[in-house]
């Protein structure tokens, strides 16, 4: 069965039994298509909605008549935007017309409406120099939803919710007395008949006449205390506006504005589509029995006779003939079914109206009126165009309301069905385009208010469109969306797969969505409608589980925002599966029986078996072959891209597969990537669609190749396409982006051919890790609890070495005392520290730096200080004016080191755009080569993660009979309880494939079976069980048992020990408690908490305990004195009073308790009020500020840090690695001499 398959430049041996019928769509089209829709249609829709803006007298009219994005005037390219920290955007120019009705004067102008962020080819945005992704949001679709609860007597009480896109909700509920109530916009409930009366049915008789005789309706009428339309209107007004004097007119206008004003109530296209689907007569009466003859009102012919069953086809005919009310009999009851009076326009109009953009059902009364009054084709078209908002109303109409009430009444008799809110037919995706459109609409409506105000204020003669329009609110709302919306996220750029997954993510969180706290289990659960649309595996662990999902591989989002998945259609006449593919939404799928992708077919597409296993909505059935409706396109159609990259996924437990999918996204790009020997065949598609590989724009011949660029001569016109390659750029997460050409000179390339490899790709396939020779064997306890034992060879040969690039920036600002200056001339710095600094004061490229080294020399003017008498004397003698500056150079932070790979300088003089107050900005990029080391986290693709516990010399590793040592030893106990057996199969197949020199593709759910793996092992000349004798590298003796050995694909994850390890001696302290801050980012200390204190108490270590609670924590004076004593080599003094104790006393004083502190002999101990009092006599400052005394901290120096502690702002800008070596110890011993009074000290 194994056969070669060509993927890009590599041939893989595939175990797939299925021919791929459907082509996988472009994996980031969710982003690209949605943004394109916004530019083509979305913007126009908003302008149409807001047109025209009139002033309050109706005299001035402002209209937007067209717009264009000025693509020729884009200021910077994508690369330049990243360098300069600007937004990649194009100016939006809008054509505006202002009409003055009095004078008839028309003014037209093109108005600039701000820069509009553009999407890059990769589906991302560059905002302020950072690459961001707009995540698609899964929200409840507008529509009518029905549900029921069972009361204590076992009776079903039905309820309904009518949800618009924006506007007032309607909620129906039934109480145990069978009275149906309605809540309008979450107010108090009213009997539903009051709403019906207010809509036009005044008397009880009219209501019963319209809706038919029904028990619950009668019960509700009895409860209803209004009898006329006017009373009903007043009753509703009292509920909605309590406390205001009710009048019929105000009630009428209130209801009109609540429901029938398109600006206040918007169903959106989706809402209208869902309404028409739910409330249509046809679906509700299909397969029911007619209670009366059903007659076509136009022709008078009988469509269905009394007592006949109404078929699906007849039901559609009834609906489209304009019949809106049908009586059907259910168990001797006659129930009236009322629809919302929408028909298919195609059954009335035979000529082509595709250019009118009417794709929904249309409102019958309006259509009927047009067709009665006009006969000419052109006139009809003209009228349809004119009345398009009446034919397809954006707001709710009375017929919708009556239909929802009728549906509620019919549910008790089994007419219609209740809805499942977690069904993907009832949840839709809001992608970039729609989110942007909503945001833009907010900005425009704010602008509309401003325009109306300006129309009334300004002189109507001289007014121009430009003067009326204020673009600030529009620009602000767009900026706010991209900068701070929950759905605009900093792109996850660790490797190409994480980028791709981020763009395909579906989030139920965000504005208008759920919140983590309120989301229950049902929302997070896997639902049968997710099949082929959302991945059941890939979702985060933790509080967001199930709320953030990933789009399945073949899924698409349709124009309404519903997720569709492709199926092959089954020709029922012939009973064969065709190659025709249909994309189907979740609610359409519910009516079908669907066969698996790997169901056996003969060469003509007929089912081989008589009985076929199929998926019905939420169960698996076995049916005869002739009943199957559809068939899956591919075995991997139900999972996402990351999950489809796990070989033998079918043999892994789901929770481990989830970890595997998530951890692949954290794999760091390695120095030498290697495509997996055992892949799944999707690696190439994922790499190409992720957008990190340069692809040929046109067919041609490669003319020139270097490390930096590739040139291709086009076949079409002989011109040359040049492709610049990225070299050692920093990604959002600090990993390294680097491209290497993979084509040769004179090579022929087609359009779309991959020209170069990027980070984590190998020959155009995604390559996140390395193929490693490993064995499942315990070794001296070093792989206890998932630890890994690795060979020194992995370190020596740079197998798991990755490059990380960090960016540091220094800015020279204007201060109150004068401008800061970037210079080489820094006070108190020896020539040795400046050896790599050039004459401008900036480090040279290629220099090797360690923590504490200067990157950019910078001095800040100091305030004039009061001079002492000695200093004044010295000044008078030597006549030297002090240089009053202090060193504020940018230095390499603690624990960082590396090589300078790039320096960028931006200055005001060169015309670079800099933030206000900044004159010069310098950015340095430091690259580190990180070899694999103890403490690094690694994993396979099956959720088998571990931490490196020991690096063993190569000669000590267990070795094979042919002398090759293993590279990694894994614990065999990590497999059985975790049930991820896929890793074992991968190891066996990799063992065979490596020997045969194959690369293998084993697609998920359609991969290699056990007999095939055994066959491969035999072919490679290995034992069938994949085990081999291993020898101990230390003694050379064989181990007692044979061991499973093979090749496993192993990833190095982004949790590197170098980023986590951290130590502090002294550093910044919290302002209030005076305790050291916490965490590596703040250069904090280790927390010694309550339980640790108990441990010392239990041990009786009194002195250690006292020291930890005072001088090592918040005894301000004690810690300075202790430090002095250590420096001078004296004994450590007694601890003082910790700050926490003073805070406690202050709290007691706040409770009006007078607390005094007494010593042993009853003398009162005086507590100094503030830090300044205490530290007056100290001449060492261990917070690392320049001046020897601890300055009182000014409020503006304090900034909030993340954990809610206060951090001294000086810490951010100044160097906090206090180098105590610099302190001159002799001074402390000897007192001060005259030479100490020069300005540098």
Curated annotation (Swiss-Prot):
Q: What InterPro entries does the entry give? A: DNA-dir_RNA_pol_bsu_ext_1_sf, DNA-dir_RNA_pol_bsu_external_1, DNA-dir_RNA_pol_su2, DNA-dir_RNAP_su2_dom, DNA-dir_RNAP_su2_hyb_sf, RNA_pol_bsu_bac, RNA_pol_bsu_CS, RNA_pol_bsu_protrusion
| MF annotations from Gene Ontology | DNA binding; DNA-directed RNA polymerase activity; ribonucleoside binding
Question: Which reaction equation describes what this protein catalyses?
Answer: RNA(n) + a ribonucleoside 5'-triphosphate = RNA(n+1) + diphosphate
Q: Which Gene3D superfamilies match?
A: 2.40.50.100, 2.40.50.150, 3.90.1100.10, DNA-directed RNA polymerase, beta subunit, external 1 domain, DNA-directed RNA polymerase, subunit 2, domain 6, RNA polymerase alpha subunit dimerisation domain, RNA polymerase Rpb2, domain 2
UniProt xrefs under Pfam families: RNA_pol_Rpb2_1 (PF04563), RNA_pol_Rpb2_2 (PF04561), RNA_pol_Rpb2_3 (PF04565), RNA_pol_Rpb2_45 (PF10385), RNA_pol_Rpb2_6 (PF00562), RNA_pol_Rpb2_7 (PF04560)
The organism named in the record is Clostridium acetobutylicum (strain ATCC 824 / DSM 792 / JCM 1419 / IAM 19013 / LMG 5710 / NBRC 13948 / NRRL B-527 / VKM B-1787 / 2291 / W)
Q: How would you summarize the oligomeric state and partners of this protein?
A: The RNAP catalytic core consists of 2 alpha, 1 beta, 1 beta' and 1 omega subunit. When a sigma factor is associated with the core the holoenzyme is formed, which can initiate transcription.
**Name of the protein in its database record:** DNA-directed RNA polymerase subunit beta
Which UniProt keywords are listed?
DNA-directed RNA polymerase, Nucleotidyltransferase, Transcription, Transferase
Give GO cellular component annotations, separated by semicolons: DNA-directed RNA polymerase complex
Q: Which family does it belong to?
A: Belongs to the RNA polymerase beta chain family.
Task of the protein: DNA-dependent RNA polymerase catalyzes the transcription of DNA into RNA using the four ribonucleoside triphosphates as substrates.
The record's NCBIfam families line, in alphabetical order, gives: PRK00405.1 (NF001616), rpoB (TIGR02013)
Q: Where is this region: Disordered?
A: 1195-1219
Kindly list the cysteine pairs connected by disulfide bridges.
none
Q: What is its EC number?
A: 2.7.7.6
Biological-process GO terms, alphabetical: DNA-templated transcription
PANTHER family tied to this protein: DNA-DIRECTED RNA POLYMERASE I SUBUNIT 2
Specify the superkingdom.
Answer: Bacteria
């Amino acid at each position: 069965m194994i056969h070669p398959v060509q993927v890009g430049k590599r041939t893989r041996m595939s175990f797939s039994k299925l021919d791929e019928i459907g082509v996988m769509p472009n994996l980031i089209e969710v982003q690209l298509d949605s943004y394109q829709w916004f530019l083509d249609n979305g913007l126009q829709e908003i302008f149409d909605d807001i047109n025209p803006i009139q002033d309050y007298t109706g005299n001035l009219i402002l209209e937007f008549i067209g717009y264009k994005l000025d693509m020729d005037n884009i200021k910077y390219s994508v690369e330049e935007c990243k360098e300069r920290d600007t937004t990649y955007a194009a100016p939006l120019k809008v054509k505006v017309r202002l009409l003055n009705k009095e004078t008839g004067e028309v003014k037209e102008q093109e108005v600039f409406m701000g820069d509009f962020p553009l999407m890059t080819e990769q589906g991302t945005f560059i905002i302020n120099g950072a690459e961001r992704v707009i995540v698609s949001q899964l929200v409840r679709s507008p529509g009518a939803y029905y549900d029921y609860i069972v009361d204590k007597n076992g009776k079903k009480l039905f309820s309904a919710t009518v949800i618009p896109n924006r506007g007032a909700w309607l909620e129906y509920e039934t109480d145990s007395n069978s009275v149906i109530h309605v809540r309008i916009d979450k107010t108090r409930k009213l009997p539903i008949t009051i709403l019906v009366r207010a809509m036009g049915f005044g008397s009880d008789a009219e209501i019963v006449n319209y809706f038919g005789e029904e028990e619950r309706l009668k019960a509700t009428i009895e409860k209803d205390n209004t009898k006329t339309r006017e009373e009903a209107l007043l009753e509703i007004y009292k509920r909605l506006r309590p406390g205001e004097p009710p009048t019929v007119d105000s009630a009428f206008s209130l209801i009109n504005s609540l429901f029938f004003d398109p600006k206040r109530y918007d169903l959106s296209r989706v809402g209208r589509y869902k309404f028409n689907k739910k409330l249509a007569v046809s679906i509700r009466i299909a397969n029911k029995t007619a209670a009366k003859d059903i007659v076509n009102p136009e022709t008078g012919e009988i469509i269905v006779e009394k007592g006949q069953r109404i078929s699906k086809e007849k039901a559609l005919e009834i609906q489209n003939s304009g019949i809106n009310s049908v009586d059907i009999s259910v168990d001797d009851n006659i129930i009236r079914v009322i629809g919302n009076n929408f028909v298919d326009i195609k059954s009335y109009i035979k000529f082509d109206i595709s250019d009118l953009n009417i794709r929904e059902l249309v409102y019958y009364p309006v259509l009927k009126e047009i067709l009665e009054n006009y006969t000419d084709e052109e006139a009809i078209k003209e009228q349809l165009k004119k009345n398009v908002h009446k034919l397809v109303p954006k707001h709710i109409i009375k017929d919708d309301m009556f239909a929802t009430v009728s549906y509620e009444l019919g549910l008790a008799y089994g007419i219609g069905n209740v809805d499942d809110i977690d069904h993907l037919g009832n949840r839709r995706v809001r992608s970039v385009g729609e989110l942007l459109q909503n945001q833009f609409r907010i900005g425009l409506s704010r602008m509309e208010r401003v325009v109306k105000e300006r129309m009334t204020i300004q002189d109507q003669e001289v007014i121009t469109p430009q003067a009326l329009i204020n673009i600030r609110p529009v620009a602000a709302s767009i900026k706010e969306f991209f900068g701070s919306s929950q759905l605009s996220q900093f792109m996850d750029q660790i490797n190409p797969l994480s980028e791709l997954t981020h763009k395909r993510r579906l989030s139920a969180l965000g504005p208008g969505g759920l919140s983590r706290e309120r989301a229950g289990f049902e929302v997070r659960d896997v639902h049968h409608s997710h099949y082929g649309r959302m991945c059941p595996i890939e979702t985060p662990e933790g509080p967001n589980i199930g709320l953030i999902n990933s789009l399945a591989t073949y899924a698409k989002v349709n124009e309404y925002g519903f997720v569709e998945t492709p199926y092959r259609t089954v020709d029922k006449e012939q009973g064969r599966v065709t190659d025709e593919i249909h994309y189907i939404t979740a609610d359409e799928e519910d009516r079908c029986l669907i066969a698996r992708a790997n169901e056996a077919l003969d060469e003509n597409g007929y089912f081989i078996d008589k009985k076929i296993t199929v998926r019905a909505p939420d169960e698996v059935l076995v049916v005869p072959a002739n009943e199957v409706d559809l068939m899956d396109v591919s075995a991997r159609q139900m999972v996402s891209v990351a999950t489809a990259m796990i070989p033998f996924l079918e043999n892994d437990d789901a929770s481990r597969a989830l970890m595997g999918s998530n951890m692949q996204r954290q794999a760091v790009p390695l120095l030498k990537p290697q495509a997996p020997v055992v892949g799944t065949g999707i690696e190439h598609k994922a790499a190409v669609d992720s957008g990190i590989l340069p692809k040929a724009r046109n067919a041609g011949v490669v003319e020139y190749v270097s490390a930096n660029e590739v040139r291709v001569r086009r076949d079409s016109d002989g011109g040359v396409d040049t492709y610049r390659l990225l070299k050692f750029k920093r990604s959002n997460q600090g990993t390294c982006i680097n491209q290497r050409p993979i084509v040769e000179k004179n090579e022929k390339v087609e359009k779309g051919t991959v020209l170069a490899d990027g980070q984590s790709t190998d020959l155009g396939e995604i390559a996140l890790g390395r193929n490693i020779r490993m064995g499942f064997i315990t070794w001296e306890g070093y792989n206890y609890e998932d630890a890994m034992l690795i060979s020194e060879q992995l370190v020596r040969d740079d197998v798991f070495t990755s490059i990380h690039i960090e960016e540091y920036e220094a800015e020279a600002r204007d201060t109150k005392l004068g401008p800061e200056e970037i210079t080489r001339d820094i006070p108190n710095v020896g020539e040795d520290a400046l050896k790599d600094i050039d004459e401008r004061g900036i480090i040279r490229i290629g220099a090797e730096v360690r923590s504490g080294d200067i990157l950019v020399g910078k001095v800040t003017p100091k305030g004039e200080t009061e001079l002492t008498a000695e200093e004044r004397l010295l000044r008078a003698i030597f006549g030297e004016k002090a240089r009053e500056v202090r060193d504020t150079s940018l230095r390499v932070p603690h624990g960082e080191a590396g090589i300078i790979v790039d320096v960028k300088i931006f200055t005001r003089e060169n015309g670079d755009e800099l933030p206000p107050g900044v004159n010069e900005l310098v950015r340095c990029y430091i690259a580190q080569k990180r070899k694999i080391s103890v403490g690094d986290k690694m994993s396979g693709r099956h959720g088998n993660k571990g931490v490196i516990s020991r690096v063993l010399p190569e000669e000590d590793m267990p070795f094979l009979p042919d002398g090759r040592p293993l590279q990694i030893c894994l614990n065999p106990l990590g497999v059985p309880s975790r049930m991820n057996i896929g890793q074992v199969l991968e190891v066996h197949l990799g063992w065979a494939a490596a020997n045969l020199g194959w690369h293998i593709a084993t697609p998920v759910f359609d991969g290699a079976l056990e007999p095939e793996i055994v066959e491969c092992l035999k072919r490679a000349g290995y034992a069938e069980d994949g085990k081999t004798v291993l020898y101990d590298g230390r003694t050379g003796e064989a181990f007692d048992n044979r061991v499973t050995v093979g090749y496993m694909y192993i990833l190095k994850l982004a949790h590197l020990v170098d980023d986590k390890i951290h130590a502090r001696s002294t550093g910044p302290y919290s302002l209030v408690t005076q305790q050291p801050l916490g965490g590596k980012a703040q250069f904090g200390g280790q927390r010694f908490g309550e339980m640790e204190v108990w441990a010392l108490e239990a041990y009786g270590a009194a002195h250690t305990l006292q020291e930890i609670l005072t001088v090592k924590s918040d005894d301000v004076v004690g810690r300075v004195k202790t430090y002095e004593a250590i420096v001078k080599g004296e004994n450590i003094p007694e601890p003082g009073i910790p700050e926490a104790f003073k805070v406690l006393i202050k709290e007691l004083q706040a409770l009006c308790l007078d607390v005094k502190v007494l010593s042993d002999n009853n003398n009162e101990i005086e507590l100094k009020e503030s830090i300044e009092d205490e530290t007056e006599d100290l001449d060492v400052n261990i917070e690392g500020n320049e001046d020897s005394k601890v300055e009182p901290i000014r409020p503006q120096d304090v900034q909030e840090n993340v954990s809610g502690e206060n951090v001294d702002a000086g810490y951010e800008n100044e160097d906090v690695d206090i180098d105590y070596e610099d302190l001159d110890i002799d001074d402390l011993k000897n007192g001060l001499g005259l030479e100490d009074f020069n300005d540098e000290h």
